[in-house]
From Swiss-Prot:
Additional remarks: Nitrogen-free medium induces chlorosis in Synechocystis, leading to the degradation of the photosynthetic apparatus and concomitant accumulation of cytoplasmic polyhydroxyalkanoic acid (PHA) granules which in this cyanobacterium are composed of PHB.
Uses described in the biotechnology field: Poly(3-hydroxyalkanoic acids) (PHA), of which PHB is among the most common compounds, are prokaryotic intracellular storage compounds with potential uses as a renewable, biodegradable thermoplastic. Cyanobacterial PHB synthesis is particularly attractive as cyanobacteria use CO(2) as the carbon source.
Organism: Synechocystis sp. (strain ATCC 27184 / PCC 6803 / Kazusa)
Protein name (Swiss-Prot/TrEMBL): Phasin PhaP
Domain of life: Bacteria
Region (Helix 2): 39-83
UniProt subunit comment: Homotetramer.
Function: A phasin, it attaches to the polyhydroxybutyrate (PHB) granule surface regulating the number and size of PHB granules within a cell. It probably also acts as a regulator affecting the biosynthetic activity of PHB synthase in vivo.
Record gene name: phaP
UniProt entry tagged with the keyword NAD: no
Localisation per UniProt entry: Cellular thylakoid membrane; Cytoplasm
Keyword Cytoplasm annotated: yes
Membrane topology: Peripheral membrane protein
Pathway named in the protein's UniProt entry: Biopolymer metabolism; poly-(R)-3-hydroxybutanoate biosynthesis
Length: 89
């Protein structure tokens, strides 16, 4: 069987990882470095809530991308097997 599909899967996995981290970093609230210890409890709580929400959104997107990549991989795998000639003994 051709290793092209496995190489394609590895490429898709790498792309998925890049998209996951870029999505997560983009969704983090801006200006987190400006938060001081003297901020109120409510401000800290809101920041934590935003971070959890953004992390969960990134997880959801990454799970969807990973499932799509796995579907594509297995579709390609079975398609390649169907194209291989069957040897008759």
């Amino acid at each position: 069987m051709n290793t092209q599909f496995f190489e394609e899967y590895q490429t898709q996995l790498l792309d998925w990882q890049k998209k996951f981290f870029s999505t997560w970093m983009e969704s983090l609230p801006k200006g987190t470095a400006e938060i001081k210890l003297t901020d109120t409890f409510e401000t800290s709580l809101k920041l934590q809530e935003e971070m959890v929400k953004s992390y969960l959104e990134a997880q959801e997107k990454s799970a969807t991308m990973m499932i799509d990549a796995q579907k594509q991989f297995w579709d390609n795998y079975f398609q390649a097997l169907r194209q291989e000639p069957v040897s008759a003994n």
